[in-house]
């Protein structure tokens, strides 16, 4: 019970911090009493705001969310290997390192110092949004899979399957 009260206090603190960064009224009204799943959903819905304002801060995420968000598509300072499965959206935050096999459509955001090793299979489409000092490594060398990159920062190594590269710097 104490843990839930602690988490709730931190989520209230997070809302106040979001408001101080200019969170829109709609998101403020919809805030409610979110659990981890709802916070992950809110992150993906408000990702542009989160990236623009570096919100929530990585330190807050590390202290309050690390290890609780993987099943909802958010990695925080973690290293894993996985297949896409049902996951359609992923975010790598902090110094995460993900090796993933993608078989369908997937939208992946990589931030901070995270690394994404992408194995793209035939017929799939992957959209990657790169920020900060992130690294994209496309492991696949050939095939009919397509990768579209919006590059706001970071570096690409082994980018042979990139179909479209939008420089946003």
Language-model-detected regions and their locations in the chain:
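Short, glycine-biased loop/turn motifs at secondary-structure junctions and
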Residues: 1-112, 117, 121, 125-169
